[in-house]
Design a protein with these regions (language model features):
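Glycine/proline-enriched, intrinsically flexible loops and inter-domain linkers
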Residues: 1-223
Length: 223
């Protein structure tokens, strides 16, 4: 059912609707800034946080007395995993690795928190198995051993008289090391700097918030 999706059947927005879509997505809870939550925490406690004034794609913790810091990130898009557990979990590991690398670090190792529904449900157990296989495949690619983690089953609720499981969520936690002199930050460094887009650019809206929430298309392949 998922792979019967055809993007050509999705309405192409005009300029007027495009503005409406942009406003809708910018205010959506899954996209809107969470700054009002995390800025309430005193991030300077212990003076180890190197990301407070110089934000990176990963959190950076200073290792005092050395030239190194620790980069940390957590990533998962459960919609990708629901669509394709193997590929979706590969994407989660890949995103974590990118966050470490784009912060100036080298990925070292992975932990995880695997959240699924009832394992006695055949589809749920299949999702679980394929997610582990996807994680294993990606971790071997990045040479990041899984040092530990936990599994949480029976994440479900009764909705309209029917038991519904959460979307499968294999959350990936990754750590890496950063040479403090090479920490990368999010901001552009100089006016007029050249910006490069790396990799192949494809016309892909699969599993997007736009498709899922705005257009109401709940099933589409993972990107």
């Amino acid at each position: 059912q998922t792979f019967e999706f055809n993007k050509d059947n999705v309405k192409e927005p005009d300029i007027k609707e495009a503005k409406k879509i942009a406003e809708y997505l910018a205010s959506h809870p899954n996209i809107a800034s969470k700054r009002w939550v995390y800025e309430q925490y005193d991030s300077m406690v212990g003076t180890k946080n190197m990301s407070t004034n110089r934000p990176s794609d990963a959190g950076i913790a200073n290792v005092k007395g050395t030239n190194n810091a620790i980069a940390m990130t957590c990533d998962c898009n459960s919609r990708y995993v629901y669509s394709d557990p193997f590929v979706g979990t590969q994407i989660a590991v890949s995103e974590a690795a990118r966050n470490i690398v784009c912060s100036g670090g080298d990925p070292l190792a992975v932990t995880n928190c695997l959240n699924f529904g009832n394992p006695y449900n055949e589809n749920t157990y299949w999702q679980f198995v394929k997610a582990i296989e996807g994680m294993s495949s990606a971790c071997r690619k990045f040479n990041t051993p899984v040092t530990g983690g936990n599994v949480s089953f029976y994440n479900q609720a009764v909705m309209n008289g029917k038991t519904e499981a959460v979307y499968p969520s294999p959350v990936i936690g990754m750590v890496g090391t950063v040479d403090k002199s090479k920490q990368m930050t999010l901001d552009f460094k100089t006016q007029g700097a050249t910006i490069y887009m790396l990799g192949e650019i494809v016309d892909d809206i699969n599993c997007s918030e736009y498709l899922y929430s705005y257009r109401g298309v709940k099933l589409s392949p993972a990107p």
